[in-house]
């Protein structure tokens, strides 16, 4: 189950993180028989939304009693809009090092793949077709060919246009497949 963590709604980030951790504990208490992992999605940081800093997620994991039942869904547009560069390679590596330090790479369980209509650090959540936005192609090439992520599910989350004469999901998937390097 993938969910955005929530917002602090004028109570401040620390109070919001505490409330989210408590809410997750309550869900796990009430649904202790369920075997579903909750994946918190990295957010762009619009308004008072939490989860746009890797540290937010790390703090939620530290404060909840059930961190073993939580993981992360990494949304490429959201992370970029939140200020995490995914290219060039040196910045990509630095972003993943920070992710590992603050959250733990083992907590990464899925990706939402999409480009961004807005720039790095804009904190605006506007998805774009792969290679057609501010991210471009290179971050997707790096992610798709990173052996750490080879077995993780990756969900295409690009815009759906009404009345489009061609299948943009097919176009986006072809673009992504073309980036895979054979070993």
Model-derived segments and their meaning:
Residues 1-71, 168:
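Active-site acidic/histidine proton-transfer and metal-coordination neighborhood
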Residues 22-25, 54-183:
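Histidine-acidic metal/acid-base catalytic patches
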């Amino acid at each position: 189950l993938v969910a955005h963590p929530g917002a602090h709604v004028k109570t401040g980030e620390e109070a919001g993180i505490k409330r989210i951790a408590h809410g997750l504990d309550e869900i796990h208490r009430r649904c202790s028989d369920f075997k579903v992992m909750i994946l918190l999605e990295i957010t762009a940081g619009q308004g008072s939304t939490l989860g746009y800093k890797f540290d937010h997620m790390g703090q939620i994991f530290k404060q909840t009693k059930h961190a073993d039942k939580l993981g992360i869904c990494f949304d490429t547009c959201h992370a970029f809009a939140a200020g995490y560069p995914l290219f060039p390679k040196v910045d990509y590596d630095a972003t993943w090092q920070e992710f590992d330090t603050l959250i733990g790479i083992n907590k990464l369980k899925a990706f939402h793949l999409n480009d961004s209509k807005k720039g790095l650090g804009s904190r605006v959540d506007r998805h774009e077709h792969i290679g057609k936005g501010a991210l471009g192609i290179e971050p997707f090439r790096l992610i798709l060919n990173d052996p750490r992520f080879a077995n993780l599910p990756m969900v295409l989350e690009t815009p759906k246009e009404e009345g489009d004469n061609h299948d943009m999901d097919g176009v986006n998937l072809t673009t992504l497949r073309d980036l895979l390097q054979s070993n």
